[in-house]
């Protein structure tokens, strides 16, 4: 990621700096902006929210969490989000502002579904809401060479 990659006159580096983001283990940059003070019976917060930014060439590596995750598009280029329930049957959606082109401003990834994302331009800023709250203890990052295996046809 570098200053040469711009969207609406702002580079990904500048957006990262202005929002106080830090590198995320799955790729991209993030900052937790909210963690609900209410907890469930196990003491886990009921929800959490982050900013998440992917720049040109950044990939949110294949991963899954044990909770529903809502992706909310905020700014920048559209985002390609690919989800896969069982390691075989995947679907891709584009998050963004161009509703006529089929983009949508949000998408829900069900609990335990595999997911990966990339920016379709210079950079993309999304928010991710997880309920119950995100916890790295309940986060699984796929091995670097893991890919879904289509049953009949290509991904």
Where are these regions (language model features)?
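Non-catalytic, conserved peripheral segments adjacent to functional cores
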Residues: 2-108, 116-117, 121-124, 128-155
